Curated annotation (Swiss-Prot):
Residues the record lists as N6-(pyridoxal phosphate)lysine modifications: 116
Gene Ontology BP term (one): isoleucine biosynthetic process
NCBIfam families in the cross-refs: D_Ser_am_lyase (TIGR02035), PRK02991.1 (NF002823)
Subunit structure: Monomer.
GO molecular function: D-serine ammonia-lyase activity; hydro-lyase activity; pyridoxal phosphate binding
Gene3D superfamilies: 3.40.50.1100
Name assigned to this protein: D-serine dehydratase
Organism, scientific name: Salmonella schwarzengrund (strain CVM19633)
Family matches, as CDD domains: D-Ser-dehyd
Lyase among keywords: yes
C-alpha cells in the first residue's frame, strides 16, 4: 500500500483509478503525426504491404467465406449514423454533443463478428503465405483460392497455431486457422464467454481454459508453443503483424468517408473512440487512422474502470512494468474483451505520442448504453463494444482540452465522432437478452 501512496503522490490520477471512478485523461505528451511517427517503428509502407497481402488473399476469402463474396473477399464493416442514439445520450446525460455521431460496425464483420477479424485473420493469412512461399508451393502472382485445395490443407495440417485470448481474438484466429488447415489451440482466460469457447470447438479448435486472467492464458500459450518447432504463437501483446492487420482500417475508412462525401480536415475534425484491452486492436487502428487523416484525427482509448491497463501504463510512463493488480484493482469486468490487467508495452510506447487521451467507464454505464442503442437504433452489441460510446460527451464537455487544441465552436459543430463498435454481432440471442436486462 505504501508503494501505491508513493505512486499517487507522483501520479495523482492513480487515486481515481484505485477508487474505480470514471476518469478522463487528456494526454499532455500528444504530438503531431510527423513528431510521433518515428517512435512507432512501423511505416506507411508496412501498412500498404498489409493491404496488398489482403488483396492477394481476397479470391481465397471470397470462396472460403461466401459472406465476403459480395465485397470481393474483403472483410470490412459499415459506418452508420446514429442520430437517435446521439439524442438519447444528450437527454440521459444533459450534455450537448456537437457534430455528428457515427458507429463503425466491426461488431458485424464477416467471419468472426469483431474487430479481431482484422488483426487475427491477417496474421494467420500472413503465416500461411510465408509457409507456402517458402515451400515453393505458391507464388505471389498465383490465384490464392488454390489454397482451398486438399493438397494445401494437407500441407498446412503439419503446422499448428497457438494464441491466448479473452475471447474475440481466439474466435478470429481459431476459425481462420481451422479453415486454412492448421491445427489450432486457443488458451482462454477465465473471462471468456462460454458461447465463444463452444463456437471454437465446433470448428475443431482445441480450447484450453484457465481460472486466471488474460496474462496467464497468453503466458501458457507462449510456453506451449515454444516446445514445438512447427507451432506458431500469435502474440497479442507484442505482435507487429496483428498491429498492421488492424492498421489497414485507416485507408479503408478514408475510402468509405470519400464515398459518403464526408470531409475530414482542419475545419472538420474527426474524433475516434476505441475500446482498449491489451491495446493491439485500438493501437493498430489508431495508427492507420493517423496515417490516413494525419493531425485531423484525434484518437481516444476507452477502458473499464476495473481494467484501466493502458491508461495506467501510458499515464505513468511505466507501460507493461505495471499492472492494474499492482494498484489493487481486480481486473473483473463485464466487458470481457477488455479484461486485461497489463497493457502491451509495444503498443503503449509506439502510440503514446499519437493518442489524444484515454478514459474509463463503469460496467453499468456500458450496460445502460447497450440498452439505449438497441432501443434507439436497433443495433445490438456486446458490453465491451459500448466503451467508445461515452467518448463524445467527455470531449464535448472538456473545455480545457478544446482550448489546448484551439477548437472553435464552428470546428466542433463540424466534427465527426466515430464510435468503434468492437464486437457483438455473433452473441447468441439468450446471452443478448441477459445483457439487455442489465441496462437501466
Amino acid at each position: 500500500m505504501e508503494n501505491i501512496q508513493k505512486l499517487i503522490a507522483r501520479y495523482p490520477l492513480v487515486e481515481d483509478l484505485v477508487a474505480l471512478k470514471e476518469t478522463t485523461w487528456f494526454n499532455p505528451g500528444a504530438t503531431s503525426l510527423a513528431q510521433g511517427l518515428p517512435y512507432v517503428g512501423l511505416t506507411e509502407q508496412d501498412v500498404n504491404a498489409a493491404h496488398d497481402r489482403l488483396a492477394r488473399f481476397a479470391p481465397y476469402l471470397a470462396k472460403a467465406f461466401p459472406q465476403t463474396a459480395a465485397a470481393g473477399g474483403m472483410i470490412e464493416s459499415d459506418v452508420v449514423a446514429i442520430p437517435a442514439m446521439q439524442k438519447r445520450l444528450e437527454k440521459e446525460y444533459g450534455q450537448t454533443i456537437d457534430g455528428e455521431m457515427l458507429l463503425k460496425k466491426d461488431s458485424h464483420l464477416a467471419i468472426s463478428g469483431s474487430i479481431k477479424a482484422r488483426g487475427g485473420i491477417y496474421e494467420v493469412l500472413t503465416h500461411a503465405e510465408k509457409l507456402a512461399l517458402e515451400a515453393g508451393l505458391l507464388t505471389t502472382d498465383d490465384d490464392y483460392s488454390v489454397l482451398l485445395s486438399p493438397e494445401f490443407k494437407q500441407f498446412f495440417s503439419q503446422y499448428s497455431i497457438a494464441v491466448g485470448s479473452t475471447g474475440n481474438l481466439g474466435l478470429s484466429i481459431g476459425i481462420m486457422s481451422a479453415c486454412i488447415g492448421f491445427k489450432v489451440t486457443v488458451h482462454m482466460s477465465a473471462d471468456a464467454r462460454a458461447w465463444k469457447k463452444a463456437k471454437l470447438r465446433s470448428h475443431g479448435v482445441t480450447v484450453v481454459e484457465y481460472e486466471d486472467d488474460y496474462g496467464v492464458a497468453v503466458e501458457q500459450g507462449r510456453k506451449a508453443a515454444q516446445s514445438d518447432p512447427n507451432c506458431f504463437f500469435i502474440d497479442d501483446e507484442n505482435s507487429r503483424t496483428l498491429f498492421l492487420g488492424y492498421a489497414v482500417a485507416g485507408q479503408r475508412l478514408k475510402a468509405q468517408f470519400a464515398q459518403q462525401g464526408r470531409v475530414v480536415d482542419a475545419s472538420h475534425p474527426l474524433f475516434v473512440y476505441l475500446p482498449c484491452g491489451v491495446g493491439g486492436g485500438p493501437g493498430g487502428v489508431a495508427f492507420g487512422l493517423k496515417l490516413a487523416f494525419g493531425d485531423n484525427v484525434h484518437c481516444f482509448f476507452a477502458e473499464p474502470t476495473h481494467s484501466p491497463c493502458m491508461l495506467l501504463g501510458v499515464y505513468t510512463g511505466l507501460h507493461d512494468a505495471i499492472s492494474v493488480q499492482d494498484i489493487g484493482i481486480d481486473n473483473l469486468t463485464a466487458a470481457d474483451g477488455l479484461a486485461v490487467g497489463r497493457a502491451s508495452g509495444f503498443v503503449g510506447r509506439a502510440m503514446e505520442r499519437l493518442l489524444d487521451g484515454l478514459y474509463t467507464l463503469d460496467d453499468q454505464t456500458m450496460y445502460d448504453m447497450l440498452g439505449w442503442l438497441a432501443q434507439e437504433e436497433g443495433i445490438r452489441l456486446e458490453p465491451s463494444a459500448l466503451a467508445g460510446m461515452a467518448g463524445p460527451q467527455r470531449i464535448c464537455a472538456a473545455t480545457v482540452y478544446q482550448q489546448r487544441h484551439g477548437f472553435s465552436q464552428t470546428q466542433l459543430g463540424n466534427a465527426t465522432h466515430l464510435v468503434w463498435a468492437t464486437g457483438g454481432g455473433m452473441v447468441p440471442e439468450d446471452e443478448m437478452e441477459q445483457y439487455l436486462a442489465k441496462g437501466r
